[in-house]
Amino acid sequence: MQEDYEIRWHGRGGQGAITAAKILAQAAYLEGYQGVTAAPSFGAERRGAPVSASTRISPETVMVVSQVENPNVVVVLDHTLLKFEEVTSGLVKGGWLIVNTKRHPKELNLGGDFNIATADATGVCSSLGLVVAGLTLVNTAILGAFIRATEAVSMASMEKAIMERFSKSKVDINLAAIAQTYEITEIEKLK
C-alpha cells in the first residue's frame, strides 16, 4: 500500500540534491503515486554552499509545493551538514534519516526518535567515475539508499526515471551507482 512521503534533501551546491528530488518524484509517478511534487529551495547558494529541496509523494493529489517542514524522510548528501540543527529539524518520530557517510548508523550518535540509514555513496560514485569539475555527484547513488530504507518506490520505477532523465551514455553508470549504494546501505531501526 502506498503511503504519503514528505522528503527534505540537504546537500551542497553541485552535488545534485535538487536533481535527486526531481528524479524521485518522477520514479514515484511511474510507481503509480497520483501526487508528486519536487521543489528546490533557492537562496544565495553557490557551488559547495548548503542547499535543500523537497519532494512530496502521495497516493492522492498533492496541492502543496512549499518546502517540507515536518518530513518523514530527510536525505543528507554531505554528512558534514549533520552539525547544523536544521537538518533533522521537524523529522517526525519513526521517520528516516538517510546519510551519505562511511560510518555505520550507530556511529553517528544522533539520538532522536527516527530510523537511520547510511551508505558511502561518495565512495561508490568515486569508484564509478561520477565526478564533474572535481565534485563527486552522489545524487543518483543516494537514491539507492532511499529505496533500501523506505521501499517507497521500486528499483524498476527508479530505473525508468533514470532512463527518462539521462542520455543513453549516462544511464548505465547512474543505474550502477543506485544498485551498488542500495546493496551497501546499513540500517538502524528505531526500537
Question: Can you annotate each of these PLM segments?
Answer:
Residues M1-K191:
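Active-site cofactor/cluster-binding pocket
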